[in-house]
Design a protein with these regions (language model features):
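Acidic helix N-cap motif at the loop->helix transition within catalytic regions
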Residues: 32-35, 60-68
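Short, acidic, metal-binding catalytic loop of nucleotide-sugar glycosyltransferases
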Residues: 39-48
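A conserved acidic beta->alpha catalytic loop
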Residues: 55-63, 104
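Glycine-rich, basic loop-to-helix element that forms the pyrophosphate-binding segment
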Residues: 76-92
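Short beta-strand-to-loop acidic/aromatic patch adjacent to the donor-nucleotide binding site
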Residues: 94-105
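Conserved donor NDP-sugar-binding/catalytic core segment of glycosyltransferases
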Residues: 109-140
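Short, flexible, basic/aromatic active-site loop/helix in glycosyltransferases
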Residues: 129-134, 142-163
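Acidic donor-binding loop at a coil-to-helix junction in glycosyltransferase catalytic cores
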Residues: 188-197
């Protein structure tokens, strides 16, 4: 689903109202960024019920910053975004599991907006939104927004037959993680965790992209050609891991079959 129109809150009624929200932040040697994102979470109009920082074997002050902010500190010694993120999701106790990166900067209404959408639209299982690059020239930010992120949402959205999850800015229902936690390639450090998670979602799981659910993100991934090439390699590796099961035509057929089942 894309965010052109408001979600229909009446399509399913079996899921209860949202009550608790956990925010998971994987962190590796990002103490300075971490301090900023934790301050942004402290300023939310609807505070998180739980903030979990996953220390991915950092050697800087990340752990100290997390404790000082009152976050729950979880240690994941296996290096990689996926191992750290998965450990955080496992530790989360909220009905909703939200995800930010250490260099994300959410606006004050980020949690409140996500909670409102997911409460009003019980059919939506995962809510995701875009990012705005904040630490680069305007032309780089525009390039990142329209080419890097725009390409991801459009091309991978066509591949999946629904919007992909953006790892720096999403919220999923707890039941979604419970369903896929044993399937994802959580031990790998050479894949995109958000793309891998998106590819493992069954046809019954609906992802909603809301263009107004924005967060600030760092331009560090796009600073060098080497960084861009590494992320392209991760994308290739992620798609290759899923083989025929993750082919576009199979995914589209599966989602169409599920849609027909819902209508019948």
């Amino acid at each position: 689903m894309c965010g052109e129109s408001a979600p229909d809150p009446n399509r399913h009624g079996e899921r209860g109202p949202v009550t608790t929200i956990s925010v998971v932040i994987p962190c590796y040697n990002d103490a300075t960024f971490l301090e900023v994102v934790l301050a942004a979470l402290a300023a939310q109009t609807r505070p998180a019920d739980e903030v979990i920082v996953v220390d991915n074997a950092s050697t800087d002050a990340s752990a100290r910053v997390a404790r000082a902010a009152g976050a729950v500190l979880v240690v994941e010694p296996v290096h990689g975004i996926w191992p750290a993120a998965a450990t955080g999701y496992d530790a989360a106790s909220g009905d909703l599991i939200a995800r930010l990166d250490a260099d994300s900067v959410p606006p004050p209404d980020w949690i409140a907006r996500a909670e409102a959408i997911l409460t009003l639209a019980p059919l939506v299982d995962v809510l995701t939104g875009p990012g705005d690059f904040y630490d680069c020239p305007r032309w780089v930010a525009a390039l990142g927004r329209f080419v890097y992120l725009g390409g991801y949402f459009r091309l991978i959205g066509l591949w999946l037959a629904q919007p992909p999850i953006f790892g720096s800015n999403f919220v999923m229902r707890r039941a979604v993680w419970a369903e896929v936690r044993g399937l994802v390639h959580r031990e790998r450090d050479d894949v995109h965790d958000d793309l891998d998670l998106s590819l493992h979602l069954p046809p019954s799981v609906t992802v909603w992209f809301d263009p107004t659910l924005r967060v600030g993100i760092s331009a560090r991934p796009c600073e060098t050609w080497r960084g861009i090439a590494r992320r392209l390699d991760w994308a290739y590796c992620t798609l290759a891991l899923h083989g025929q099961a993750g082919s576009p035509w199979r995914l589209r057929l599966a989602r169409r079959a599920w849609a027909r089942r819902l209508r019948s």
